[in-house]
Amino acid sequence: MNDPSTVRLIAAEFAGTTIVMLGGPGLMVLGGGSIGALEAALGFGLAMAIAIGVIGAVANPIFSLALFLARQISPRESVSDWIGQLLGGIFGAALVFGINDTDRVPSAANGWDHSGFAELGSVLAAELVLSVVVVLVLLSAVSQRLATTSVAAFTGAAYGMAMLFLMRIDGGGINPARSIGSALFADTDPNALGQLWAFVVVPAVGAVGGLMLWLLIDEATIDDTVFDETLVETASDVVTGDD
């Protein structure tokens, strides 16, 4: 059996997502006011490239969702990924919170209508579009069977570019694990948890959108995804009660 073990998947995603949390939110918080949007985006992109290319993780729940929808990973693998990513996001945020002191910027949470961020409509649009773009890059790189280092480089570059775009809009989201971890430890930001839904739901929708766009430009078809006729038949059986 060549499938990675559940423990290995969880451990890899935990480590990879922790690296992303340190390279992104960690740099933003511990660097204080000296870290600009470009430096933060570079940190996010490099950390993602390291997580994919060296650790063997994808370090983002919407990446795992897209790979599952494209039949690149199994349901078991996707669930293992999500567990590891959530734990890594929380642990990474806890590390940053523990290292931080009162002289530094206290929060790297996402949001809107505060701290100089854009309004909700702009945030939702940006999160959706950038999620589609980054997922498209990942699926295109994987479907072309590029070397892992190339997948890591292209995906990391796309992720960093997206974060540079998003930094002034909402603090850089498109990664539910990153957003959840940061929100839990954003003790000085009362909006963080209440606004968290946008940074979980919208990127997930963007992952589906990225998959659909990928199907339009790739040689793959809908039958190569979980949305093939088998899914329709299974759903029909559930509704009608047929075995």
Task: Name each model-derived stretch.
Residues M1-D243:
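Membrane-interface helix-loop junctions and terminal tails of multi-pass membrane proteins
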